């Protein structure tokens, strides 16, 4: 039996959804308002960052596209937090935003399962609370077995630049008015959110000698775990750093009423971790300066991007601010910054599969769920696509737990909590961040990916071969005493200590130690680093594993969808309200809902066992 899934929107979430669905050999209608905006990066010209870069790698292992697209269009790579612990390290890449968009457009054309349609979806076809398709602006219908809505910041969106307000999407594109209204009419609860973007500057109008060059010594970096064609350092495009100053701060504080953020035009909540420059200066007046990163946008564009300077000031004030920055005295602004306000929908209206609770086979992914960022959007698109396909194929859902992936952390947060501002993934959100690392993504997810048919046999067998060598080395380290290695005999008084325990010392590096071992243990630096992390942080990881097992046991205790929590004695009223609203499918999910405590879980567990 053949199926058709319609994906509304072709940004980072929509593209991942479309491509992953196509891997299940299911036909996809991919709807986009303007084909020229397919795969666009309307804000920052970068992929990755703390937690986000790990998500991009998780997407890659699970058969997604973002990592490959970024690697094919990278201008520069950085390993962030390299001087800190492994739990917070992640890759970030400056990308060629035009090349990135063109790459995705070419991939869509090559995919025989994806039917690209330039049109606007204005309503859904629903029968008996089950999706049947979408209605287009011209009145035509696209019958579909499932629909995934990935509309980004386009729903009833407005842009703000000073006192100028326009009904449009990012980069002066069309917006979507009717779809959001019709979703609200069907009972979905909405929230109004806001984000912003900085002005773009003509790169030849700047004096880079007055800026601080961002030194980059990172080599052999890539998002895709299968990509070994690394971008050489000498070919990487540099970024620069400048800072705001007191003159800029005084100018901003004097002219706050000329910003849409402060003149009453915008009531929507903006991103907590990415505020506008006027918001930063106003809220953090004690700070003498703020960082502004000068970043390339594309080899085929004559503009640069100012990370850290998003604004909704009038063009006149924007120009004054820019020309007070070091090296920007003669700066020419090619495009002014603006704020954008849009509809999102409360994500606690979704199941952990990202299927809506109100309408069967309807899925939401990306910024429609109140998230910010390309990586968060792509991760949701991937998971919505996988689960939409699996459901049609009558296979079990694919849900990543908080201890398995950052994607799991994000989706669990979204469906169990109430979002009040644009959600951004942070390492601090993950309780198991020492396990959810940049280096062990394959180890965590490739088996699941292979079982889903999203990783090919050759890639999986290469991983198993590498894993076997890794375990052989670990076994050798555990069973070999320091005294047996001549080069180490006099460096340690305790010669009976195993090499494994010897490597737990902070000053010992496994890659140096390995040079004195037999040739068959000479593994690649990436694998050695992974082993070293696991040895040095063994105690913490084991503690996490113990908790994982407890969580796994809870996940096996199912809760009926119609379960009445009022019948459970000693259950807190907040827990009754939250659980009745969310309807978790098992105790593990119930335990992660904000407002549900340990005693509540024990009470429910006891009740379920008593009344089985």
From Swiss-Prot:
Predominant location category: cytoplasm
Keyword NAD assigned: yes
SMART domains reported in the protein's UniProt record: GIDA_assoc_3 (SM01228)
Pfam families, sorted: GIDA (PF01134), GIDA_C_1st (PF21680), SAM_GIDA_C (PF13932)
Cofactor: FAD
Chain sites annotated for binding NAD(+): 270-284
Binding site for FAD: 9-14
Compartmental location: Cytoplasm
GO cellular component: cytosol
Region forming the signal peptide: none
Keywords, alphabetical: Cytoplasm, FAD, Flavoprotein, NAD, tRNA processing
Alphabetized InterPro entries for the sequence: FAD/NAD-bd_sf, GIDA_C_N, MnmG, MnmG-rel, MnmG-rel_CS, MnmG_C, MnmG_C_subdom, MnmG_C_subdom_sf
Any Gene Ontology biological process: tRNA wobble uridine modification
Protein origin, superkingdom: Bacteria
MF (Gene Ontology): flavin adenine dinucleotide binding
NAD is among the record's keywords: yes
Quaternary data: Homodimer. Heterotetramer of two MnmE and two MnmG subunits.
Family that this chain belongs to: Belongs to the MnmG family.
PANTHER family: GLUCOSE INHIBITED DIVISION PROTEIN A, PROTEIN MTO1 HOMOLOG, MITOCHONDRIAL
Role: NAD-binding protein involved in the addition of a carboxymethylaminomethyl (cmnm) group at the wobble position (U34) of certain tRNAs, forming tRNA-cmnm(5)s(2)U34.
Protein name: tRNA uridine 5-carboxymethylaminomethyl modification enzyme MnmG
High-level lineage: Bacteria, Bacillati, Mycoplasmatota, Mycoplasmoidales, Mycoplasmoidaceae
